[in-house]
């Protein structure tokens, strides 16, 4: 079972739909409807942090849940707000983007790592955000796995743990390869099941 944390965003159920199409069993909970302890007691095979309208500090249990997932090596993927939230517990800073993006389709450049494995570079992805993880503050444990042409971080992964984030919206109809990106994340949860 995947635990999907809903950060009160209209895109949440697009994620639910895409993940369901890929065969994932989901338990969807609002970010303020359970504690970190309750979330981890569900023993999720993976955790997805949805987009949302706020900054990571106001996203309910997201920040401490990332810490708990990291300590337990539970695969975790963040989308938009969820991606930004991944940067903070490891020491990164979330700042205002140079230009707010609301429904802009942009080209994503990458090296085929993390959840962007086996995708062409560049590909088209939809951006809805006014905040970004600041590259200058990115801690050594996180690596940039995708970026815009002007170098803004659009995807990151933990170097040792199964933790991944994408700033763009793979669940948007305008984004290319959304199902494949989510499938790549699901494969990290399945590999851990097989190893257990």
Curated annotation (Swiss-Prot):
Enzyme class: lyase
All residue ranges annotated as the Glutamine amidotransferase type-1 domain in the record: 1-195
Top-level lineage group: Bacteria
The EC number(s) this enzyme carries: 4.1.3.27
Family annotation (Gene3D superfamilies): 3.40.50.880
Catalytic activity: chorismate + L-glutamine = anthranilate + pyruvate + L-glutamate + H(+)
Pathway in which the depicted protein is active: Amino-acid biosynthesis; L-tryptophan biosynthesis; L-tryptophan from chorismate: step 1/5
This protein's UniProt keywords: Amino-acid biosynthesis, Aromatic amino acid biosynthesis, Glutamine amidotransferase, Lyase, Tryptophan biosynthesis
Known function: Part of a heterotetrameric complex that catalyzes the two-step biosynthesis of anthranilate, an intermediate in the biosynthesis of L-tryptophan. In the first step, the glutamine-binding beta subunit (TrpG) of anthranilate synthase (AS) provides the glutamine amidotransferase activity which generates ammonia as a substrate that, along with chorismate, is used in the second step, catalyzed by the large alpha subunit of AS (TrpE) to produce anthranilate. In the absence of TrpG, TrpE can synthesize anthranilate directly from chorismate and high concentrations of ammonia.
NCBIfam families: trpG_papA
Protein name according to UniProt: Anthranilate synthase component 2
Species whose genome carries this gene: Azospirillum brasilense
Gene coding for it: trpG
């Amino acid at each position: 079972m995947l635990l999907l944390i809903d950060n009160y965003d209209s895109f949440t159920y697009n994620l639910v739909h895409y993940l369901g199409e890929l065969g994932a069993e989901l338990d969807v909970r609002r970010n303020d409807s359970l504690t970190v302890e309750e979330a981890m007691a569900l023993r999720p095979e993976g955790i997805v942090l949805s987009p949302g309208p706020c900054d990571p500090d106001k996203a309910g249990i997201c920040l401490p849940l990332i810490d708990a997932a990291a300590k337990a090596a539970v695969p975790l993927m963040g989308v938009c707000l969820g991606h930004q939230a991944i940067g903070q517990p490891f020491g990164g800073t979330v700042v205002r983007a140079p230009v707010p993006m609301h429904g802009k389709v942009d080209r994503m450049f990458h090296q085929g790592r993390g959840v962007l494995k086996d995708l062409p570079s560049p590909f088209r992805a939809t951006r809805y955000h006014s905040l970004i993880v600041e590259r200058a503050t990115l801690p050594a444990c996180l690596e940039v796995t995708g970026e815009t042409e002007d170098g803004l971080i659009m995807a990151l992964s933990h170097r040792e743990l199964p933790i991944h984030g994408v700033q763009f919206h793979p669940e948007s109809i305008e984004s290319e390869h959304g199902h494949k990106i989510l499938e790549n994340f699901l494969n990290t949860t399945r590999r851990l099941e097989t190893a257990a």
